[in-house]
């Protein structure tokens, strides 16, 4: 598989405080990569660099290189709207917009300039099916998306991200606010979808990372400690500190 996103020597500072210390990490296409590590290690900060979600934070400075399909995403010619269409995001707290399920899914399509009602209808249905939420919503497309359960709302958010046909979806702890049953349903959905999309997921749940990811990156204190196939890292980590973290000795 080819690398769809590459990062080289990425540093990020908030004012005089450096949060990322030169991370170099590549992501293979149509694989699910988990970013793990203790709270405050830089997982979410790094994830948000990959589609420039950190841009509006005051006094932030980012250096190094991040490329999406060999294009420098921090270059002067990068179109942010296009980047975020290709590299979508699902947040920790389910965040559907306060309007109907249909309009939530259609939102990104309309922003992208799609006006064909038939095409929008088709994409709405396809995306809700991909996110395994069609059965619960097909007779309630006009219902406010915020009226559904937390797990259903998160799958609606995943469907909204998929509707614009991104190539990569960033997931920032997508199940941490959900109950175990809803979390399991999201995991099953991701296992189905990872054959068609590239996923990069921050998770505190090591069992979740071992169950559904193909590759794992372990970060600590703003440094990349270890990266490799998930099965290899969990069975035979290369570094003692990785073994200590995976075995619950800290974190």
Curated annotation (Swiss-Prot):
Assembly: The complex is composed of two ATP-binding proteins (PstB), two transmembrane proteins (PstC and PstA) and a solute-binding protein (PstS).
Keyword Acyltransferase in record: no
Keywords on record: ATP-binding, Cell membrane, Membrane, Nucleotide-binding, Phosphate transport, Translocase, Transport
Membrane-crossing segments per the record: none
Localization of this protein: Cell membrane
UniProt GO molecular function: ATP binding; ATP hydrolysis activity; ATPase-coupled phosphate ion transmembrane transporter activity
UniProt family annotation: Belongs to the ABC transporter superfamily. Phosphate importer (TC 3.A.1.7) family.
This enzyme's EC code(s): 7.3.2.1
Sites where the protein binds ATP: 37-44
Enzymatic reactions: phosphate(out) + ATP + H2O = ADP + 2 phosphate(in) + H(+)
Keyword Membrane belongs to the record: yes
Membrane topology classification: Peripheral membrane protein
Domain ABC transporter, residue spans: 5-246
CDD domains, sorted: ABC_PstB_phosphate_transporter (cd03260)
Entry GO CC: plasma membrane
GO biological processes: phosphate ion transmembrane transport
Protein name as catalogued: Phosphate import ATP-binding protein PstB 2
Function: Part of the ABC transporter complex PstSACB involved in phosphate import. Responsible for energy coupling to the transport system.
Top-rank taxon: Bacteria
Main location: membrane
Pfam families, per database record: ABC_tran
């Amino acid at each position: 598989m080819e690398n769809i996103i590459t990062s080289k020597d990425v540093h990020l500072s908030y004012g005089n405080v450096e949060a990322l210390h030169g991370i170099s990490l590549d992501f293979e296409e149509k694989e699910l990569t988990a970013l793990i590590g203790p709270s405050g290690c830089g997982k979410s900060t790094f994830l948000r660099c990959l589609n420039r979600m950190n841009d509006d934070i005051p006094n932030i400075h980012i250096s190094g290189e991040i490329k999406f399909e060999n294009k420098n995403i921090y270059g002067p010619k990068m179109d942010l709207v296009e980047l975020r269409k290709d590299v979508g995001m699902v947040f920790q707290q389910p965040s559907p917009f306060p309007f109907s399920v249909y309009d939530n899914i259609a939102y990104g399509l309309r922003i992208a300039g799609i006006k064909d009602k038939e095409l929008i209808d088709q994409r709405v249905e396809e995306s809700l099916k991909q996110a395994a939420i069609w059965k619960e919503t097909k007779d309630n497309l006009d219902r406010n998306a915020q009226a559904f359960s937390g797990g259903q709302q998160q799958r609606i958010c995943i469907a909204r991200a998929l509707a614009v046909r991104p190539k990569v979806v960033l997931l920032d702890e997508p199940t941490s606010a959900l109950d175990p049953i809803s979390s399991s349903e999201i995991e099953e959905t991701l296992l189905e979808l990872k054959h068609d999309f590239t996923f990069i997921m921050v998770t505190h749940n090591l069992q979740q990372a071992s169950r559904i990811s193909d590759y794992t990156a372990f970060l600590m204190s703003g440094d990349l400690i270890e990266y490799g196939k998930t099965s290899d890292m969990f069975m035979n980590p290369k570094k003692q500190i990785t073994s200590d973290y995976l075995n619950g000795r800290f974190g």
